[in-house]
């Protein structure tokens, strides 16, 4: 069974990847959609043509990560494509945002991405692809967005190194450094409450 695994699939770029690939990718049997909001995943799955496995998981939670790795071990699919879109960014000066929120950002944007990639790689074959959602923030440190920019620099650097490591196996790695849409309401909603 050939599958596509998408993290952060309940909204944003993750949702968009799922919808676009569902229409245009005919060489896979199933999509595995991962996000915390299971109800949103069900809505998305209902509008897709492919079979969808819904995995309502918090990737910063060790037990939830185990659900993913155990599902892979049990079903032994061929992961044709892994798309890591799960992530978020908190706006605000470093000392103004509580440290727990910032370490949570690092956990999801970096550690979870590493763990999902590590868990999926044994099930990838030649011509499989890994797409990591970085950001244009990876290229430029940003005051007021410092932790987010640092996590995206990590994603970019990790992706470049992994691409070189996997080249002989013909597993392709792409880091997408998108700029995002400028939507003030959305950006404002990510700001720490004291800065809104």
Residue spans for each PLM region:
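Conserved glycine-rich cofactor-binding loop
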Residues: 10-11
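Conserved NAD(P)H cofactor-binding loop of Rossmann-fold oxidoreductase domains
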Residues: 85-90
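Active-site helix of classical SDR
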Residues: 117, 151
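Residue(s) in the substrate-gating loop at a strand-loop-helix junction
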Residues: 135
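SDR active-site lid
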Residues: 164, 168-196
């Amino acid at each position: 069974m050939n599958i596509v695994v998408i993290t952060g699939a309940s909204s944003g770029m993750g949702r968009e990847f799922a919808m676009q690939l569902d229409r245009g990718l005919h060489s896979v049997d199933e999509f595995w959609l991962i996000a915390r909001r299971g109800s949103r995943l069900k809505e998305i799955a209902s509008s897709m043509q492919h079979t969808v496995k819904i995995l309502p998981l918090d990737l910063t939670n060790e037990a939830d990560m185990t659900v993913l790795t155990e599902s892979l071990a049990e079903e032994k699919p061929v992961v044709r494509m892994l798309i890591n879109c799960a992530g978020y960014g908190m706006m605000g000066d470093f000392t103004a945002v509580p440290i727990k929120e910032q370490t949570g950002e690092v956990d999801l944007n970096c550690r979870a991405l590493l763990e999902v990639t590590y868990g999926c790689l044994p099930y990838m074959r030649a011509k499989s692809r890994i797409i990591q959602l970085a950001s244009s923030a990876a290229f430029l440190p940003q005051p007021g967005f410092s932790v987010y920019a640092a996590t995206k620099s990590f994603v970019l650097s990790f992706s470049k190194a992994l691409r070189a490591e996997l080249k002989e196996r013909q597993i392709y790695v792409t880091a997408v450094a998108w700029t995002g849409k400028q939507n003030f309401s959305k950006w404002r909603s990510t700001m720490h409450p004291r800065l809104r």
